[in-house]
């Protein structure tokens, strides 16, 4: 697989397999998993935005723990159909939200959804192969169920650091090894593995929240910068 193809996954949308699991009888190769495409946004929205997800995703608690302030800016990388993007935009802090995705159909869908819901603080962003293409530095990067799809993570997160404001944070939410939902077992991480990888990329863990039953919830800052 080429390096560009691996990095293409840095802003992949939430995966159907990741959200709803894969039976133990199925086998998926590393290449198959990493190269899966998601170009039917309207159909995927039925799964990604299923209200039943709220019971284990706990979006309101997640947003409360992000402790956003008015006037701040967020990048939702791998925004998919906007599950967190829309909730962030409608939250009390009402931050500006860059809804970032690699799939053109997702980006179009996000733009249309923002317009339909009159969310002037949402901007849909088409990611490139090796960068989220953020138009400005942000206070928070949120990466939900996408970390395990990012190829060349050390390089990617070092580049991402340039898009963080001083005191900026990166919040990573991804599936636990024993979650009933999620990607194949080989694509799941322990918190220690995520912390180790982020440390190599120049980040330090500033918070770990154990409120989600099926996912890790870790927050990082640049190691040599103070966190907010």
What are these regions (language model features)?
Residues 71-80, 171-195:
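Conserved class I S-adenosyl-L-methionine
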Residues 117-130:
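Conserved SAM-binding strand-loop segment of SAM-dependent methyltransferases
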Residues 132-141:
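A short acidic, Gly/Pro-enriched loop at the edge of an enzyme's catalytic core
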Residues 154-169:
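A short glycine-rich, Lys/Arg-flanked "PGG" loop and its adjoining helix->strand segment in the class I
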